[in-house]
């Protein structure tokens, strides 16, 4: 990503201690080099990585995906560039993006999978059962749920009719965990629910699985075919421009078809748990949200607390604003999103480290 000839400095004890104790990101590395600029310099070998670090609003992986698409559009629309120069720049951008993607995989393996226990740990019942109430099957007999407010009057009456007329076996709840995470962390939720016989459970790792290099590689790229510039990119008739669009990776296995089969099969409620609903998944989320069988969208938001444990803000509004971008029909969006008074913060689980 970048190179620095700092070897001439680290022989100095003071510089060596400074490097070890205070340099832990790119900004502190730049500061270190400025203090010893007579001896060393910094040169980037990956311009995409440089742009990531120069952006002050890159906080999530979706921001990196958005930045990739932005740079792809800049190259595509630059009238001063000849066609061959555009192709060359896109080839370089794709190679640099691949480097960042490989670093993402390495980070997740080293800092998550190899470091934390992702399995259910005996004796940690309080932690692992925080999600039980959230993932309980919908039931008109559950007085804690305000189903008549989370659904339209018509849908609620239909729910009541179903519970009155269907047998216990046919009235089982269905849970489809659409996992956008690359690790197995989300599987903890399903393992807890394995104790619940009234819930039929399925896991769909729609963005791939870390370590699976065959049928289900991680799908890190961009997925907004609704963007007004996508048709321009598509019409260039060069597959290099489409290399990192998620739709083509979805077709490498059956996960996407399994999702479509499910949403076509019956009415459903969407629970948003930890997903920012950013534009990089716009095509997929539009398919889910605007589908006629999607009857309700319930957001579990994140709270930020001060040092005294008092909530100072949450991201409910930010999430529903992001959700709105996936709707062509805004009236439909307002009808489906469950209002904040009926939603709740997403439980936070502290994973234990491996020993």
Provide a role label for each language-model segment.
Residues 1, 259-355:
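SIR2/sirtuin-family catalytic core signature
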Residues 2-251:
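Extended, H/D-rich, highly charged conserved domains that either
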Residues 160, 183, 253-257, 282-285:
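Short, well-ordered alpha-helical scaffold segments within catalytic/effector domains
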Residues 163-167, 174, 256-262, 286-287:
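Generic recognition of flexible, low-complexity loop/linker segments
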């Amino acid at each position: 990503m970048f190179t620095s000839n700092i070897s001439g400095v680290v022989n100095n004890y003071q510089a060596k201690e400074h490097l070890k104790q205070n340099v832990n990101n790119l900004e502190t590395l730049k500061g270190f080099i400025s203090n010893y600029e007579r001896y060393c310099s910094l040169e980037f070998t990956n311009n995409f990585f440089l742009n990531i670090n120069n952006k002050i609003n890159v906080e999530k992986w979706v921001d990196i995906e958005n930045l990739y698409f932005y740079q792809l559009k800049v190259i595509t629309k630059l009238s001063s560039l000849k066609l061959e120069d555009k192709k060359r720049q896109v080839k370089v951008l794709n190679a640099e993006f691949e480097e960042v993607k490989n670093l993402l995989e390495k980070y997740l393996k080293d800092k998550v999978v190899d470091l934390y226990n992702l399995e259910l740990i005996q004796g940690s019942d309080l932690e692992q059962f925080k999600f039980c109430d959230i993932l309980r099957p919908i039931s008109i007999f559950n007085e804690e749920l305000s189903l008549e407010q989370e659904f339209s009057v018509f849908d609620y009456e239909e729910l009541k009719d179903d519970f009155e007329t269907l047998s216990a076996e046919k009235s089982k709840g269905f849970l489809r965990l659409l996992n956008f995470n690359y690790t197995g962390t989300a599987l903890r939720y399903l393992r807890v629910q394995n104790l619940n016989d009234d819930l039929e459970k399925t896991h769909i790792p729609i963005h791939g699985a870390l370590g699976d290099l065959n049928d289900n590689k991680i799908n890190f790229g961009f997925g907004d075919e609704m963007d007004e510039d996508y048709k321009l990119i598509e019409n260039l008739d060069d597959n290099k421009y489409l290399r990192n669009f998620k739709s083509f990776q979805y077709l490498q296995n059956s996960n996407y078809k399994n999702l479509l089969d499910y949403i076509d099969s019956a009415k459903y409620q969407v629970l948003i748990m930890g997903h920012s609903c950013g534009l990089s998944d716009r095509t997929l989320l539009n398919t889910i949200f605007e589908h006629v069988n999607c009857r309700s969208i319930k957001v579990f938001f994140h709270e930020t607390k001060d040092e005294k444990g008092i909530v100072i803000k949450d991201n409910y509004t930010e999430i529903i604003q992001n959700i709105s971008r996936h709707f062509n029909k805004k009236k439909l969006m307002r009808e489906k999103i469950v209002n904040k008074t009926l939603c709740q913060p997403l439980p936070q689980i502290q994973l234990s480290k491996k020993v």
